[in-house]
Amino acid sequence: VDVEACKSKGIAVGITPNGVRRPVAASVLTYILALSGRLMVKDALVRGGPSTFAERAQHMGTGLVGKTLGSIGLGNIGTEVFRLCAPLDMNFIAHDPYIDPTIAKSVNVELKDLESIFRESDFLTINVPLGEETRHLVNSARLTLMKPTAYLINTSRGPVVDQTALVTALTQGVIAGAGLDVFDPE
């Protein structure tokens, strides 16, 4: 929503971050579970008809215990993601230059620099608003920092991720996969 254009025409715009906090965080958790369990691949195998045990065994997925969940952004949604994921026994890291460190501590999150989040995360969730400093925050250079076994999850805003760079990273095996519910253009 172009807030400035709305203001200039006398149109009120309301932002309700608590209204979507839990549903968006639940979506992130759903992506984590689906990606780690290779759910989409398993679905395709089932829909494709009978498959062998060997074919299915190649897509068993990975456990989450001890894996690192990283977040770029630790506001209402980011903190809720960590609250929901607490029972999964993962390591939590985040980058948010605007957050009070006591908030990070309250959800057992270690704050780190941006590049470390890309390097260390097994699952990286994006939880930032769209602005000039966040447009294409996830770009080719940062995607190449990620582990080839890592997954990117974006439920924030589409233009935060350079989609051309993401497609390249996925097709070249730079990262293992992605879960998106936002795209560019939105």
Predicted regions, residues:
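Short, small-residue-enriched loops and turns at beta-alpha junctions
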Residues: 22, 131-135, 159-160, 185-186
